[in-house]
């Protein structure tokens, strides 16, 4: 078999559908190639051994992943689609071998998720693109925002795929997976994240210039003022490479996952070396944890969306899949004009469903707190409280 693939080598949509449908009933065994057959065939049996497919085939599979050729209604069908492509080209091997080989040339990792969608594949391509730009970002350039990047990569991927179909050359498609789109070409179309660069581990944030906005300052009594925030940040000891602002934002991101109540026990350490517990102690000297975090709410919101990391306890708190990014208790500050503004605004505004879900959750928690007033179950105590018209306690709210 000629290892150089052309357009005729790739299966059509109809052929893939037919192959997949039949594979779901009884997967056909791919044809054996000469190199697949062991020399010892004295008993007339043919045993299969793994042979690594050529780069051209792997690139073709990667191209189909990136371009959305295999959109994938579910993970099983997606697996069978890839297997069908290998069978069409005449190569054997189980799906795990295919995935390991594809990793070398296409998305890293090939998603081990129960559902695989084109948008998710594009998002991973975009994140890989951001990782490759880390060196440039450290020099002061800014990464594209997630939504704009996905849109740009999607358009570039589709254009490259259309061209590959015409020319029969699928090799350039793999560059979409590894390099994404030209940042200079799309720089005017993408948003900056508050003059920040974000590394792939999702924890390290570094301001590259102008750590606090110089524009007109709006203040709110529900969040810390810029002066208060700076006074707190001046107390944070950091390493030479990390600014106090970075540590402060990392603390706010941690609070989005752990909570910003005065009762929260903060775990973890900032990249500057200060523990979040110590930062929390500095914050409490000037304002509440929630007021401090609210100042960085918009930056935290952009960060959660960029890294596709909703607050970890969103399901526990009753949020739905569509409202999960609103599951942190200072979410209401995302729409507050007094919060630290990203340079080009939010990646996206909160949806009405997210706002409703957060407000409902806040209302339920406040009511539960107000009703949780029984310190004794004795008959005398409960009767006395009932006779007095109920226990009167201070009213609390999100501004605590």
UniProtKB/Swiss-Prot annotation:
- The protein's organism comes out as Botrytis virus X (isolate Botrytis cinerea/New Zealand/Howitt/2006) (BOTV-X)
For the keyword Phosphoprotein, the answer is no
Function (record text): Required for genome encapsidation.
Polar residues bias locations: 1-10
* Gene behind the chain: ORF3
Q: Which domain of life is it from?
A: Viruses
* Localization (cell): Virion
Task: Answer yes or no on keyword Chloroplast.
Answer: no
This entry's Gene Ontology molecular function terms read: structural molecule activity
Q: Where is the composition biased (Acidic residues)?
A: 16-28
Protein's recorded name: Capsid protein
- Which cellular component, as a GO term, is one annotated location? helical viral capsid
Which family is annotated?
Belongs to the potexvirus capsid protein family.
Identify the stretch(es) annotated as Disordered. 1-54
Q: Which UniProt keywords apply?
A: Capsid protein, Helical capsid protein, Virion
Looking at the UniProt entry, the stretches that span the membrane are none
